[in-house]
């Protein structure tokens, strides 16, 4: 079962309430705090490109890659609609070979949590290191282990709509505490408002949750120095209530 196939088409609808502007402002603040002269950015796992559109408005030069051709198709449509000059390409972050160097690599909305094995995580980190100038910044977010174990995932239902359709998504998580992975089954019901015709599809997203010591070690192996991590929502120090965390590393 391919991840982000049917789901990609409806991705923008499901996350229409996501505050990309606020998140981009957070990223801008962190890049200015921990980086120097950040101008050129590569986005690993760019999805539909919404973060990049916001960052371009802040005068960054952005490019994005994603393993899902369906996501890249939507990203290109979004950029064209906004008149933004952003290069979006289909590529796997685990094997990406950059044609140039960047001042920062971003990997947002838990893309690194989709890397379930140590090998995959290290491969993605190595790709990021290859992509960076000396002292470049690698900024990513993940599901944060202490928070996930303190407030374990439960079944959730989300209902959204646009002018043409209504969508209902049921997320059913199953935890594998030996592998630190949560397998989330998404069952999605789409109903056309005009015809009342319904269709259903399912995707399974396997999400790894991480702990700081293991990421610190893997970053070192990939050629980075971990310089900061914090709660994604508050930018305060992480705690047992932090479900997601930013990690910021410098290329060394």
Each predicted region: which residue ranges?
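Conserved class I S-adenosyl-L-methionine
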Residues: 1-45, 50
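Class I SAM-dependent methyltransferase SAM/SAH-binding core
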Residues: 49-95
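A short acidic, Gly/Pro-enriched loop at the edge of an enzyme's catalytic core
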Residues: 97-104
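A short glycine-rich, Lys/Arg-flanked "PGG" loop and its adjoining helix->strand segment in the class I
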Residues: 122-134
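Conserved beta-strand signature within the Rossmann-like core of class I S-adenosyl-L-methionine
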Residues: 135-142
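SAM-dependent methyltransferase
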Residues: 142-216
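C-terminal lobe and adjacent flexible extensions of AdoMet/dcAdoMet transferase-like proteins
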Residues: 206-252
């Amino acid at each position: 079962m391919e991840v982000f196939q049917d789901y990609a088409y409806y991705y923008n609808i499901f996350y229409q309430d996501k505050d990309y502007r606020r998140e981009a402002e957070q990223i801008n603040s962190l890049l200015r705090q921990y980086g120097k002269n950040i101008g050129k950015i590569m986005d690993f796992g760019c999805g539909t490109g919404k973060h990049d559109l916001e960052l371009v408005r802040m005068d960054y030069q952005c490019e994005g890659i994603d393993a899902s051709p369906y996501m890249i198709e939507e990203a290109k449509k979004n950029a064209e609609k906004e008149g933004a000059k952003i290069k979006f390409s289909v590529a796997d972050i685990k094997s990406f070979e950059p044609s140039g160097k960047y001042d920062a690599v971003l990997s947002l909305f838990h893309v690194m949590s989709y890397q379930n094995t140590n090998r995959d995580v290290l491969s993605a980190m190595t790709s990021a290191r290859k992509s960076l100038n000396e002292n470049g910044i690698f900024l990513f977010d993940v599901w944060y282990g202490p928070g996930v174990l303190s407030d374990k995932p439960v079944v959730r239902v989300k209902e959204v709509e646009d002018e043409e359709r209504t969508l209902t998504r049921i997320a059913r998580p199953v935890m594998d505490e030996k592998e630190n992975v949560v397998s989330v089954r998404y069952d999605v019901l789409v109903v056309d408002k005009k015809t009342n015709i319904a269709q259903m599809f399912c995707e399974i997203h396997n999400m790894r949750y991480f702990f700081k010591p293991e990421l610190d070690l893997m970053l070192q192996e990939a050629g980075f120095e971990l310089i900061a991590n914090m709660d994604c929502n508050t930018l305060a120090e992480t705690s047992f209530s932090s479900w997601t965390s930013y990690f910021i590393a410098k290329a060394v």
